[in-house]
Amino acid sequence: MEVKGKETASVLCLSKYVDLSSEESHRYYLARRNGLQMLRDRGYEVSDEDINLSLHDFRTVYGERPDVDRLRISALHRSDSTKKVKIVFFGTSMVKVNAIRSVVADILSQETITGLILVLQNHVTNQALKAIELFSFKVEIFQITDLLVNITKHSLKPQHQVLNDEEKTTLLKKFSIEEKQLPRISKKDAIVRYYGLEKGQVVKVNYRGELTESHVAFRCVW
């Protein structure tokens, strides 16, 4: 019992030296960087300078306990300047309807957007979800833990390529099939959510492995 007491005391003593603010800023840093990369992969204009910002420089700019409002990201689409998306970070509190309405009102008072991505650290209420459905633009919800790692960079994840409308039409004609005959991939799939895909869009999946032959498959979002 005496040993356990000493161990507990040691843990409590060491906990004083754990910098929770550093952990917090690191989480925000990773989520923001991967959010920027996600936007670029969706075809939005994102600078190398923003993506390659170091953790040290991030903390210099935003501090050890970043203000979530300062972490917001706006980006225009490279091929369609009418498309503008915004990423908004929330703190650790439960996200209620008033918080959603306040954030959206603040954004729309300054700019016009066609898409909004919310990065949360807690649950969102049903009332808030219902309010989100009423907005005229697409709203996507990610937990901050979803963005701590870029899943497209994982060594075990096959490469995914999103087909445009012309490539999709060519594919269907080549194999003389209809869209509904393609193998499906769920809208809830992590890759589908990463690219923000909609029902009917098609992805080309390149499988490469040391134990299996390389092959290509096509999946239709359903």
Curated annotation (Swiss-Prot):
GO biological process, one term: DNA-templated transcription
Gene Ontology CC terms: RNA polymerase V complex
Principal location listed in the UniProt entry: nucleus
SUPFAM superfamilies xrefs: Eukaryotic RPB5 N-terminal domain, RPB5-like RNA polymerase subunit
Tissue specificity: Expressed in roots, leaves, siliques and seeds, and to a lower level, in flower buds and flowers.
UniProt xrefs under Pfam families: RNA_pol_Rpb5_C, RNA_pol_Rpb5_N
Null allele phenotype: Partial loss of methylation and silencing of RdDM targets, probably due to the redundancy with NRPE5B.
Cited Gene3D superfamilies: RNA polymerase, Rpb5, N-terminal domain, RPB5-like RNA polymerase subunit
Keywords carried by this UniProt record: Nucleus
SS bond list: none
InterPro entries recorded: Arch_Rpo5/euc_Rpb5, RNA_pol_Rpb5_N, RNA_pol_Rpb5_N_sf, RNA_pol_subH/Rpb5_C, RPB5-like_sf
UniProt signal peptide: none
GO molecular function: DNA binding; DNA-directed RNA polymerase activity
Protein purpose: DNA-dependent RNA polymerase catalyzes the transcription of DNA into RNA using the four ribonucleoside triphosphates as substrates. Component of RNA polymerase V involved in RNA-directed DNA methylation-dependent (RdDM) silencing of endogenous repeated sequences, including transposable elements. Required for establishment of DNA methylation.
PANTHER family per record: DNA-DIRECTED RNA POLYMERASE V SUBUNIT 5A, DNA-DIRECTED RNA POLYMERASES I, II, AND III SUBUNIT RPABC1
Family statement: Belongs to the archaeal Rpo5/eukaryotic RPB5 RNA polymerase subunit family.
Assembly behavior: Component of the RNA polymerase V complex.
Stated name of the protein: DNA-directed RNA polymerase V subunit 5A
Source organism of this protein record: Arabidopsis thaliana
